[in-house]
């Protein structure tokens, strides 16, 4: 069964890079949302294996942490693993304190460490 990932708040270029990585290494289907409301709706209607949230949403500059806390407080999505996509360690630490699993930064997108983190939720690399 194909793994499903929701990618929230990435610009077109970063969404493309993440999508390519997830398809190549995990044969994952990647859906995209641009806002808190879209993410909440998508998570309520699809069984995602992982949600990736940009630290700052590209469409409006809003905080990805707000998306994280909303998803984690919603019974429909509270159990879905969520990662914040950020190069900043303080953002990663804050995300984990708010219920996320350890994420990664875009600078480390192609690293073995990132693939290992993603593999914990998406299975073996393809």
Where are these regions (language model features)?
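Conserved acidic segment of CheY-like receiver
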Residues: 2-13, 18-22, 51
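Acidic, metal-coordinating helix/loop segments flanking the phosphotransfer/catalytic sites
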Residues: 34-50
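Conserved phosphotransfer cores of two-component systems
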Residues: 44-46, 72-78, 98
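Conserved phosphotransfer microenvironments
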Residues: 52-71
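Alpha4 helix (beta4-alpha4-beta5 surface) of REC/receiver domains from two-component response regulators
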Residues: 62-63, 87-104
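A short, hydrophobic beta-strand element within the central beta-sheet of small alpha/beta folds
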Residues: 78-89
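C-terminal output helix
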Residues: 108-118
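The C-terminal output helix
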Residues: 119-126
């Amino acid at each position: 069964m194909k793994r499903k990932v929701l990618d929230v708040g990435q610009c077109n270029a970063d969404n493309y890079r993440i999508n390519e990585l997830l398809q190549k290494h995990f044969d994952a289907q990647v859906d995209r949302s641009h806002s808190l409301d879209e993410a909440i709706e998508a998570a309520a209607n699809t069984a995602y294996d992982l949600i990736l949230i940009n630290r700052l949403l590209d469409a409006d500059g809003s905080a990805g942490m707000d998306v994280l806390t909303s998803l984690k407080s919603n019974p429909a999505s509270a159990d879905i693993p969520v990662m914040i996509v950020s190069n900043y360690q303080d953002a990663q630490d804050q995300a984990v304190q708010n219920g996320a699993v350890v994420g990664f930064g875009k600078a480390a997108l192609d690293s073995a460490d990132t693939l290992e983190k993603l593999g914990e939720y998406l299975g073996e690399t393809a």
